[in-house]
């Protein structure tokens, strides 16, 4: 590490959100450009900075600051320079000259220890003197806090967050219970808090540590799709995390229950432990679904006649099950329509829409992702929105919503129980993708009396987020469900659809016969498989399906295998978008982002600003939010502004600071999970050995059904057979079914 010191000459750039600052310091006539997260430095201050010199592509040598210390001015010249800089509001150059002329080298001590004496100077009242003193105290408090936090290895950007949250309480919090940070500060997890606790000297069997570990494991479980964990599984994972053998878990669970952080329920003699937020979500969703489940009397002949009119006008013929779906949508406040590809879901939904249009009803259509909404729009001929957009997402939690803020929930929907959606009918497609959190937000915005129609394929993979909403609703048996199973004649001509249903039913799929849309390319070994995929994606498929290379998609079950996402993305990046002197790049860990790269947003960020632009680059629409699964292309990497601009498929431009690039990953290849709700002209699926838990029928079925015109399976036939025959799936712990049944049991008991 190297050190530099000097006066802060000027602030060139500062990002007010994350504190990233570019500034010059001067010492002995030498000027040095420094960069780093230094939210609280000001022009005129004298600092000593620790870090290293780095070479910038445009600005040559810069000093990258990792930590710094402020040195109080200790002579008249230094004080004059500091006060003249504008660091203290209310003091300009002339006033600074008067103050220094009066107090000389003793100026700074007097300002800190005897601020009332500043009132001796013409133009400074006693209230102004106290204001100057308070500003100095605030700055001193901030600097002291930064130094204190850095002693425990806390980086400056995180230190900024901590100080903004706690102020001068940080000393007691860090020394007594640093695990509070994991509860209160977005971006601080248990492991960070645990590292701080270790430095502070908190014992490994501390009550704070054990309770924080329990809560951390429960929250981590939600990232695996669970809304709760069985007691034994929770205990095992907490012991593995803490590296201790905790004896009396019941005591800590009782404490966390009393603190309203968790809920413990017994199901089939098994103790189930929930983070309270997710228990409440499932309970709320159950209650709101129950409220929407109302029945309406309507004459069957009237319904049949209206369906017949629609059939005649549209030139279609519905089968009995499709007609039943329309009738149930008419007679019920809530209905679920499920079925695989080619079973007539789109025709059924379009008929329902036409039926309600004849009633003069206001209809809203939505899907979980931009791609899914686009598919729904194209299929139905009516505009569909993402659920987030329909609910009018805002980039922050409402004032006073400390629970959401503490939980790290940075999204807020303008449409809710106080401002419901203005619609008579709401249709939501791709329901298998909807997690419990989004379902909770959606239902809050649906008024009793509004019809809700949920559409999806229950055999697809469940949502990436926690819960198993569609499956749980259907399995409860408490709401009207229509399952479409017949494959219609036009769909029956597609081997994609025929084979998808065969896979789902466990029937044999013939791979060695000629097919126009379901191809199997036999290759052995990962490298041979990848070489065949290269030929397909660049030379064969674009013309065959009439699509751009970037519109095709490689889908793979895993991230880490020889044909996993990470390896394939590196290989395909070099193949499809090789390095070039005119293309700017940015390295993030092991990944290089390059102008022209295909990328994907991998987490929901409700505060990212976006804009749409005219053909001349003029902004025409603005908003916030980029969502998990959004795909686009890197348009520009600016080393000057230190940001990356991505153009997403729906025309949104989003600019990411370099510090935000962990929200993106290359998307030449993506996991099957990430492809949910999307449809591509052609998909390429490697058939090579991978983790057994991912080599199953559910994954294969979902991957195959993502293709619109062509499926290309490349690899070993025995892997295909293994996946098609493996019906085991990762257990997902969810209990929406239980909450629904509890509501119904209470109602039945009341009657």
Regions found by a protein language model. Name each.
Residues 458-624, 743:
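Conserved helicase motor core of P-loop NTPases
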């Amino acid at each position: 590490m190297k050190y530099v010191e000097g006066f802060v000459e000027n602030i060139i750039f500062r990002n007010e959100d994350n504190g990233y600052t570019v500034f010059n310091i001067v010492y002995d006539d030498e000027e040095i450009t420094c960069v780093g997260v230094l939210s609280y430095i000001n022009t005129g201050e004298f600092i000593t900075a620790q870090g290293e010199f780095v070479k910038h592509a445009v600005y040559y040598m810069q000093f990258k600051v990792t930590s710094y210390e402020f040195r109080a001015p200790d002579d008249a010249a230094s004080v004059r320079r500091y006060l003249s800089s504008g660091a203290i509001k209310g003091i300009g150059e002339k006033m600074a000259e008067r103050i220094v002329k009066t107090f000389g080298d003793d100026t700074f001590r007097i300002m800190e220890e005897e601020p009332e004496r500043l009132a001796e100077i013409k133009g400074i009242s006693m209230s102004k003197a106290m204001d100057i003193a308070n500003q100095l105290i605030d700055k001193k408090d901030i600097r002291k806090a930064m130094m204190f936090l850095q002693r425990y290895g806390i980086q400056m950007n995180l230190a900024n967050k901590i100080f903004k949250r706690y102020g001068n309480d940080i000393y007691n919090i860090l020394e007594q219970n640093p695990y509070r940070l994991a509860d209160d500060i977005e971006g601080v997890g248990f492991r960070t808090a645990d590292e701080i606790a270790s430095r502070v000297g908190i014992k490994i069997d501390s009550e704070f540590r054990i309770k924080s570990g329990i809560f951390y494991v429960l929250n981590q479980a939600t990232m695996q799709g669970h809304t709760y964990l069985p007691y034994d599984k929770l205990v095992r994972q907490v012991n593995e995390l803490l590296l201790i053998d905790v004896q009396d878990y019941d005591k800590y669970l009782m404490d966390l229950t009393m603190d309203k952080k968790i809920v413990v329920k017994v199901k089939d003699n098994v103790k189930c432990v929930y983070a309270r937020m997710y228990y409440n979500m499932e309970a709320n969703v159950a209650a709101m679904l129950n409220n929407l489940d109302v029945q309406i009397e309507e004459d069957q002949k009237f319904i049949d006649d209206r369906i017949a009119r629609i059939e005649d006008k549209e030139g279609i013929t519905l089968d009995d099950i499709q007609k039943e779906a329309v009738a149930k949508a008419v007679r019920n406040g809530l209905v679920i329509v499920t079925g695989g590809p080619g079973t007539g879901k789109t025709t059924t939904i379009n008929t329902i829409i036409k039926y309600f249009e004849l009633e003069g009803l206001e209809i809203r259509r939505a899907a979980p992702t931009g791609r899914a909404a686009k598919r729904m729009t194209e299929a139905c001929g009516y505009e569909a929105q993402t659920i987030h957009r329909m609910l009018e997402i805002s980039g922050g939690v409402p004032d006073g919503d400390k629970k959401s803020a503490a939980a790290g929930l940075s999204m807020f929907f303008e449409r809710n129980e106080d401002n419901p959606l203005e619609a008579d009918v709401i249709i939501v497609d791709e329901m298998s993708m909807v997690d419990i959190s989004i379902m909770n937000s959606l239902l809050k915005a649906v008024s009793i009396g509004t019809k809700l129609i949920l559409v999806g394929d229950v055999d697809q993979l469940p949502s990436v987020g926690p819960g198993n909403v569609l499956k749980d609703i259907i399995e409860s048996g408490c709401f009207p469900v229509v399952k479409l199973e017949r494959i219609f004649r036009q769909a029956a001509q597609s081997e994609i659809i025929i084979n998808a249903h065969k896979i789902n039913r466990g029937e044999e799929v013939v791979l060695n016969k000629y097919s126009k849309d379901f191809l199997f390319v036999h290759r052995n070994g990962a490298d041979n498989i990848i070489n065949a995929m290269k030929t397909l994606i660049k030379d064969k498929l674009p013309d065959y399906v009439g699509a751009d290379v970037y519109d095709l998609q490689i889908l793979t079950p895993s991230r880490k295998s020889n044909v996993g996402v990470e390896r394939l993305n590196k290989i395909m990046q070099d193949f499809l978008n090789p390095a070039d002197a005119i293309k700017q790049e940015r390295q993030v860990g092991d990944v290089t982002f390059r102008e022209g790269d295909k990328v994907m947003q991998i987490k929901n960020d409700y505060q990212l600003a976006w804009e749409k632009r005219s053909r001349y680059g003029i902004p025409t629409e603005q908003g916030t939010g980029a969502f998990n699964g959004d795909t686009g292309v890197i348009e520009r990497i600016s080393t000057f502004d230190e940001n990356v601009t991505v153009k997403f498929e729906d025309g949104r431009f989003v600019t990411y600071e370099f510090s935000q690039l962990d929200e993106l990953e290359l998307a030449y290849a993506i996991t099957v999970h990430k492809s949910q709700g999307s449809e591509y002209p052609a998909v390429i699926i490697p058939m090579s050995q991978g983790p057994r838990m991912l080599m199953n029928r559910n994954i294969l079925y979902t991957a195959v059904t993502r293709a619109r015109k062509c499926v290309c399976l490349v690899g070993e036939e025995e892997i295909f057979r293994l996946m098609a025959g493996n019906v085991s799936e990762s257990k997902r712990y969810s209990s929406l079914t239980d909450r629904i049944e509890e509501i119904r049991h209470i109602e039945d008991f009341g009657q």
